[in-house]
Amino acid sequence: MPAFLNPAEAEFWVGAGLLIFLGIVFFGAKAHKAIAAALDAKAASIQANLDEAARIRDEARRLLEGLQAERAEAERQAKEMLATAEVQVRQFEAEAKAKLEEAIERRRRMAEQKIATAEAQAAAEVKAAAAELAAQMAESVLAQRLTGAKADPLVDRAIGQLASKLQ
């Protein structure tokens, strides 16, 4: 048996090492390309994922900024609406107070007018009663004076008209 086929001989191991080396060189170049291509594909995939993550992060940041701006605008509008409502409440309160004071003043004037009318009516009634009483007294006094004397029909008529003229 030749020496390079006997595993006990050094030539065998030198030949085996040479074949392994040549296999690595020959197949390693092809394997290197395949490994490099696989690594490049993996790197491209990772880079695409990183780019997508960066794009999503930027989009999320823009959305967050937009939402924060909308929230700030909504808060500003709410404060503005609250201030407007407070002003309107003060205006309504002032208007209601003015209307109430006006109604109270109008009712006070009406009450004063009613009191003045009642006073005038009472004074007129007292005056009428006094005139009626005076007419009756005058009629009574004249009737007593004229009873002894001859009663003149003209005097009787004048006494009868006296009550209506005093009123």
UniProtKB/Swiss-Prot annotation:
Which parts of the chain span the membrane according to its record? 8-28
Q: By its UniProt entry, which Pfam families does this protein fall under?
A: ATP-synt_B
A molecular-function term among this protein's GO annotations:
proton-transporting ATP synthase activity, rotational mechanism
Keyword terms: ATP synthesis, Cell inner membrane, Cell membrane, CF(0), Hydrogen ion transport, Ion transport, Membrane, Transmembrane, Transmembrane helix, Transport
Q: Organism's domain of life?
A: Bacteria
InterPro entries from the entry?
ATP_synth_b/b'su_bac/chlpt (IPR002146)
Q: Where in the cell is it found?
A: Cell inner membrane
Membrane-topology annotation of the record: Single-pass membrane protein
Cellular component terms (Gene Ontology): plasma membrane; proton-transporting ATP synthase complex
Q: What is its main location?
A: membrane
What family does the entry list?
Belongs to the ATPase B chain family.
Described by its record, this protein's role is as follows:
F(1)F(0) ATP synthase produces ATP from ADP in the presence of a proton or sodium gradient. F-type ATPases consist of two structural domains, F(1) containing the extramembraneous catalytic core and F(0) containing the membrane proton channel, linked together by a central stalk and a peripheral stalk. During catalysis, ATP synthesis in the catalytic domain of F(1) is coupled via a rotary mechanism of the central stalk subunits to proton translocation.
* Subunit architecture: F-type ATPases have 2 components, F(1) - the catalytic core - and F(0) - the membrane proton channel. F(1) has five subunits: alpha(3), beta(3), gamma(1), delta(1), epsilon(1). F(0) has three main subunits: a(1), b(2) and c(10-14). The alpha and beta chains form an alternating ring which encloses part of the gamma chain. F(1) is attached to F(0) by a central stalk formed by the gamma and epsilon chains, while a peripheral stalk is formed by the delta and b chains.
Q: Which HAMAP family match?
A: ATP_synth_b_bprime
Its recorded name reads ATP synthase subunit b
Q: What is the source species? A: Phenylobacterium zucineum (strain HLK1)
| Name of the gene | atpF
